[in-house]
């Protein structure tokens, strides 16, 4: 895992087309903005896991 330190307003690049910008810090919460092409899905981890779980459940035999 790469660990980076950024200040509010600073950005990091993921590949050539994705940017992640620190928008604010309040207590133990960090607000970030992600700019990515439409074809790249961006989700919070818990949402991504739910999507994957739902896909898996739909693919199981006996589920309609």
UniProtKB/Swiss-Prot annotation:
Give the record's GO biological process terms.
mRNA catabolic process; negative regulation of translational initiation; positive regulation of translational initiation; regulation of carbohydrate metabolic process
Q: Where in or outside the cell is it found?
A: Cytoplasm
Q: What is its main location?
A: cytoplasm
Q: Which domain of life is it from?
A: Bacteria
MF terms from GO for this chain are: mRNA 5'-UTR binding
What Gene Ontology terms describe where this protein resides (cellular component)? cytosol
UniProt cross-references to InterPro entries, sorted A to Z: CsrA (IPR003751), CsrA_sf (IPR036107)
- Keyword flag Flavoprotein: no
Span of the signal peptide: none
Could you list this entry's UniProt keywords, alphabetically sorted. Answer: Activator, Cytoplasm, Repressor, RNA-binding, Translation regulation
PANTHER family to which the protein is assigned, alphabetical: CARBON STORAGE REGULATOR
Subunit organization: Homodimer; the beta-strands of each monomer intercalate to form a hydrophobic core, while the alpha-helices form wings that extend away from the core.
The similarity annotation says: Belongs to the CsrA/RsmA family.
> NCBIfam families given for it?
csrA, PRK01712.1
Record's function text? A key translational regulator that binds mRNA to regulate translation initiation and/or mRNA stability. Mediates global changes in gene expression, shifting from rapid growth to stress survival by linking envelope stress, the stringent response and the catabolite repression systems. Usually binds in the 5'-UTR; binding at or near the Shine-Dalgarno sequence prevents ribosome-binding, repressing translation, binding elsewhere in the 5'-UTR can activate translation and/or stabilize the mRNA. Its function is antagonized by small RNA(s).
This chain's protein is named Translational regulator CsrA
